[in-house]
Amino acid sequence: MKTRVTRLTVAAPNDVSALAQAIESGEVDPTRVIAVLGKTEGNGCVNDFTRAFATSTLKRFFAERLALNETEVDERIAFVMSGGTEGGLSPHWLVFEVDDSAPSRDTTTPGLAAGVAFTRDLRPEEIGRTSQVELTRDAVLRAMAAAGIQRVEDVHFVQIKCPLLTAARINEAAARGQSVACHDTYESMGYSRGASALGVAAALGDLPGDVRDEQICREWSLYSSRASSSAGIELLRNEVLVLGNAPGWDPEYRIGHAVMEDALDAQAIERALASVPGGDKIKLTPERLAGLLVKAEPSASGSIRGNRHVMSDDSDINGSRHARALVGGVLAGQLGDTRLFVSGGAEHQGPNGGGPLALIVRS
């Protein structure tokens, strides 16, 4: 078996020209695509419709290529669009394919394994609560099974797309006599991301016990070092992509992870590379970098290594947007590449002010 990752630069949220060219050249086989991750150039907030624009464009594109309707495409491909390319970050897509028929060229080295799973649609009153934690946990376990990953320690990154609350959704719940986790629609993004991340932590055995509603977005000592969740208005379910290394998968692509302890922790790249099977023999160059995924969030302390920051005090630009620009610049400077999947909002995803980082390399 083999997972292939193709990184494509895009000119706009509806730009499928690079993807079409990759398919025409044989670089990408649309029948094997299981997920498309994308950084779009919106604000990453509630009213960022670049995510929905890109998702609807991609669904229509694959429906035409696969001779399916969009509902059928929705059942086989996870579309995870993360808004916000602040600073020098470059909008791009990461296309994940799985070829079940490809034999591994090296049976001694585990290779990149990928699997997807979806929850059912969440009701508004379930977003940001234990129901979302439990549904996510179950979906992560199903995605692991789809990837053939048997040990939780072989999972290096779990990327999730999750829903958020809108005024209409809050009112719909109230009409049925149901309460919601919060009434601020932007704040609901954090609750959804946090509950999703805790679902990953529960699936991977990183929690001391069951999660309670009152712990979500409050008890920050609970977190996953391998979860990345991105909230959006364009869906009602959680879409889960599990990435790890497993025997029997071709090792041309491999993954490793580490945790950025703060926004300046560029050394996390080296630690992530060290966790890649055979990573000590890999010299990381732009050609070998298949993808980088990382979470970013302003530290709640208001400082970075003892120096004050004002990311959380800016009334014009949300703090997560500042954090994406900062972390993106730190990592791009190390890698010489701005096509990095830097996602803001790291509730229960790594330590305060830091976040999980995953590195996909090509041998």
UniProtKB/Swiss-Prot annotation:
Substrate binds at R51, S82, G83, R193, S230, A231, R324, S343, G344. It comes from the Bacteria. Residues 253-363 are annotated as: RU C. InterPro entries: AtzD/Barbiturase, AtzD/Barbiturase_RUA, AtzD/Barbiturase_RUB, AtzD/Barbiturase_RUC. It is an enzyme of class 3 (hydrolase). Responsible for the hydrolysis of cyanuric acid, an intermediate formed during catabolism of s-triazine based compounds in herbicides such as atrazine and polymers such as melamine. Catalyzes the hydrolytic opening of the s-triazine ring of cyanuric acid (2,4,6-trihydroxy-s-triazine) to yield carbon dioxide and carboxybiuret, which spontaneously decarboxylates to biuret. This is Cyanuric acid amidohydrolase.
